[in-house]
Amino acid sequence: MPFMTASSPSLLQRLKSLSLVTQILIGLIAGIALALFAPEAAKGTAFIGKVFVSALKAVAPILVFVLVMASIANHKHGQETHIRPILFLYLLGTFAAAVVAVIASMMFPSHLVLSTDNIAVSAPGGISEVLQSLLLSVVDNPVSALMNANFIGILAWAIGMGVAIRHAGDTTREVLGDLSNGVTVIVRVVIRFAPLGIFGLVASTLATSGFGALIGYAHLLAVLLGCMLFVALVMNPLIVFWKLRRNPYPLTLQCLRESGITAFFTRSSAANIPVNLELSKRLGLHEDTYSVSIPLGATINMAGAAITITVLSLAAVHTLGIAVDIPTAILLSVVAAICACGASGVAGGSLLLIPLACSLFGIPSEIAMQVVAVGFIIGVLQDSAETALNSSTDVLFTAAACLGEEQKAQRPA
């Protein structure tokens, strides 16, 4: 039969020939369909999602350690990196996100029905405690840092070892480069399983949680997600345009599509580091720069966390009828930005830093912790959107700074 030739591609071959983003989209649609039509079967797919997230989390610490160490060890004298402008963009973006959240919360105030149930969690006592936590993370034992995915400690040791090995022989540096390439190959294999992992995560999450619990907090969620969308689609492109002086949307949308989607479903900036490193490589960015800025961004570039802290804190303020003047709102933006930068150093992330911001308005800890409880209830969407914004912004600002510096170097003197 002439139409049944050996050259006809099978369904599996056709799927393999599609881009990773398209495969992820198919996995996403399949996960939603399974949760809708066979919820019991969908619950069983949770294991696939857990395996994928665990694999990403397992490979991320060693990848960052080896990649940064190899990058610094093989860095040639006189070769430029663009870390300083990226750091500036990270801080500017986080502060801008906090300002957007303050304005949105003033325009569309949210009111909460605060629960009387107390959650037994411990929040940091002040900004100094968050900063102390970060400093202690820097001087953490290297083995402990790798085991616990303490990326501040991993970065500190990788930079220190890289600087020390720069003075070693060429053979040592070549071995380190080969080791880095080997880890990168493993990462690529893990990322190829993203469509299956996201299928499992989406199907099991929708089947077990659903979105019924979120209906009561629709207004609060609308403000939170609206702020995050505004920052992702308006504020960040404005910052990129200021840096590149050209249409920022092709780059912005590529970062959201290829980094934001996986981050949304894994809900982990650390797990998304390998995805961002791979995207940076495909964009042709400076390896010595992105190998440091991407893991650093996963720790301190927290626009989504700044929005969460600000919106939920001001929701508590509006609920209690506390008046907020402009200077206090500006101070809240600064505090939220600083807290957000320390969110990765606190177990529970941005939600447990809400009492710290609430303390600006004299809100007692008991009430602030009830606001944290609300945060946990809406966490299905809030945490996913926050991580997607945080992680996609890491690679967006890295690309903007690298491309901007390249443009500057090419301009005639």
Swiss-Prot record:
Main location: membrane
Pfam family, one: SDF
Signal peptide (from-to): none
HAMAP family recorded: Ser_Thr_transp_SstT (MF_01582)
NCBIfam families: PRK13628.1
Task of the protein: Involved in the import of serine and threonine into the cell, with the concomitant import of sodium (symport system).
UniProt-recorded name of the protein: Serine/threonine transporter SstT
Organism: Pseudomonas fluorescens (strain Pf0-1)
